[in-house]
Amino acid sequence: MSAVTFRSVAAESGWSLGAVQKTFPTKEALVRATLAYAQSSIAVRLSADPGRPTLRAWLVELVLATLPLDDARRSACLIGVAVSDRAPFDPELAASLAAWDADLRGKLQLLAGRARSEGELHPDVDGDVLARAVLAFAAGVAGQLLYEPRDEAHVRPLVQATVAALTPAPTAPPLE
């Protein structure tokens, strides 16, 4: 967890090193607080009229919002990687990540259900499979962009094509 240190948090937040150490008595407490902060920034993105104007367009913007395409998102991705790398060795952190993922998948499943009922999404698309695929794709692309940065103009077509493949529209009945 070299990315999350008392000094780096103090520098980023504008707090004194002593204030950070007093607020977070252990590195584990600091890591958990950093994770909670990162999750809250994603939650704000999720709350902005989810699934609109279409599920497909919204998922594209959601994935792009989580990719390291600028300094702020790159920092968030680095924290995410550092936290997830630590999770197998920290049961409390692992439980927090698992709960967050389950909640996010549940919300994406609800949006998929709404899109199916509104005729936007093929009825055979399973919401859980869609949610897991979108999250796995976003994590994979984010990881690649950390070591091979690209700008949004380069990445957007890839995200659009992948989300389109994961969200097929209902097929039209044959003409008679």
PLM features: residue spans?
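Residues in soluble alpha-helical coiled-coils and helical-bundle/repeat scaffolds
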Residues: 25-29, 33, 50, 54, ...
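Hydrophobic/aromatic residues within well-ordered alpha-helical segments
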Residues: 27, 34, 38, 42, ...
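Hydrophobic alpha-helical connector segments
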Residues: 33-36, 44-77, 127-134, 156
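Amphipathic alpha-helical segments used for helix-helix packing
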Residues: 71-95
